[in-house]
Each structure stands twice: as structure tokens, then as C-alpha cells.
Amino acid sequence: MCGYERMIDEIDQQIISLLQDDARLSNAVIAEKVGLKSSSVFDRVKKMERKGIIKGYVALVDAELVDKPIVAFIRLSVGSVSEDYLESKRSVEDICAAEPDVLECHAVAGEDCYVLKVRAVNPKELEKLIERIRCNAPVTRSTTSIVLSTVKETAKVFPG
């Protein structure tokens, strides 16, 4: 396989898929579904946790029900390539990491340098968030798109 060793097999993928659907499933239930003993499932899950394949377990929250209904994507540019470029990128990344309303920050290729996924209580709070980012980071351009509706949103790597 050209020096590439698979980190997980098909059974691990099935286990991950089941945990992505319901992280509270017991090892016994998972074992029954994948055809293993409960102890084998336990060992496989622990191994995937140690390797960092399974990074953690989270509760999926309906953001609208906790008063964060506004979703937006912000595209940022930090200027042209220069000696300050890497420092500018680090500054943007530090600000995004510290900002609780920034859910995701992706360095991208193309016209922009970053794409952020953010949530806000209302348009005014979104505006304040954009101002905080623009005022504290060396951003040369930002473009914001507010989400009208979400057709698909998932964190699943292996569909079930």
C-alpha cells in the first residue's frame, strides 16, 4: 500500500459509526451489532482513544433552543505574502481560538486565507463579533454569509 498503513479496520469503522450515532451505547450493545465480545469492543475503543482516532465525546446541542440561532460563515484575508504574513496568520488563529463564538476556523487555499463558522444570538452580536475579529487581527478583507437554513450538518466521518 505504498507505505500507508491503515489505522483502523472495517469493524473499527462500524464501532465509530455506532458511537457517532449514540456515544452512550454500551459496549455490549455495540458488540452485538458488530459481532464481537463486549471486552473486544472495549479494547478497540480504548485503542482508538489512545491513538487519538476518537478524540472525545460531546453532546449535540440545538443551538436555536439555547439562544444562538444565527449561523454565519466569515471568509478572511490577511494580505499578501511577506515577512509579516506568518505572524499575521498566527494572530488570526490565536484570536479565533480564543473567541467562543467561533466554532470552526479553517485555513484554506484560494482567494481567502480562512473560513470561519460562527454562531451568534442576533445580527447585532454577529456584527460585534466581526468587529472584534477585524479590530484585533491584521485582516485585509472579510466577507460574511449568513445561513438562511441548514440542509445538512454532520460531524460523522463514517456514515451509519
Go through each PLM region and give its residues:
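A compositional/biophysical signature of low hydrophobicity enriched in polar/charged and small residues
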Residues: 1-160
